[in-house]
Swiss-Prot record:
This is Type II restriction enzyme Cfr9I. Its cofactor is Mg(2+). It holds the Pfam family RE_XcyI. Belongs to the XcyI type II restriction endonuclease family. The keyword Iron does not apply.
Amino acid sequence: MTNKIVFPEPKQQVDFAFSLKRFRGIYLQNALLETVRDMDIVALDTQLAEYVNKADLATLATYGLRAELLFPVPVLLETNPFLLGYYRLLMGYSQKEFYGKDKGFNAGCFKSMEVKGNIGKVAKPKISELCHAFCSVASSLLQGVGPLRISRELLDDLTLLTVGPQLRGGANNQRGADGIVLVFEIIKEIVSHAVAEVRENAIEVNSATGRNVLIEFAPDPDIIIREEMSLDNYRNVVAIEVKSGTDVSNIHNRIGEAEKSHQKARGHGYTECWTVVNVSRLDMDKARKESPSTNRFYSITDLSLREGEQYEDFRRRVLSLTAISAAPTP
């Protein structure tokens, strides 16, 4: 009997497992305990007594917990700047809101501590202020979860609740980058017989017009095709937005994002705007309403086949708009 219920391989969870192992060694409770083990405990306790109110110290002592599990102090962050990530995760702040300029945290200067493990010149004199701010919200957290009986396990669970979305966001970003690279590689294959030069972020091809055509990675839109009219003077031809997310329920939000990018591209003179998606089902009528600037919608899956109606349409249009003849038949 053939089983009709088939699930995809849990690749993302496998990736998460390895990422979580790395997180535990750098940002989670394991890293904190390893750091404290090699520190001068007297110096640490002196600062904890200075930064943490007596009632909170007493509450933690009741449960046999050291205060640094919840409260950061300068000597600790100076010993291991990566631990800023632990306290950020524990308080439930995403990287975007904690370090972003538009959230009002004023914590952007500390990002290198979590990301690179070093304290910048601007951040160094503000470490004390950072710790006071953390200790204030940590006190609120301690009071708020008090009825649940505070424990190391609970604190570890709270950090993991913030890690999850961060890992998923990282996976989504990676999926997005992979999708852009895949579409770029497909274009590269289509024009390979006319390539004049391959650079890290661009392909230069010889067109039938005698002018160079550049196919490039770009920040917004994702891929652009431009024709060089003269030195440093280009005709903008094609703007391509790649939306690699596989969540069907979210695809129309992504198409809305593509529309914003294409509107900018139109403003810069691009004559063709394409949107490449990575979902199996797409309501084309709805998609066209959400992105009227998109001339053509393509599927990453169909393009990856290197054959079929969508791929052939994509191939013909790339060749036509770059003024390149088709590759000779072997």
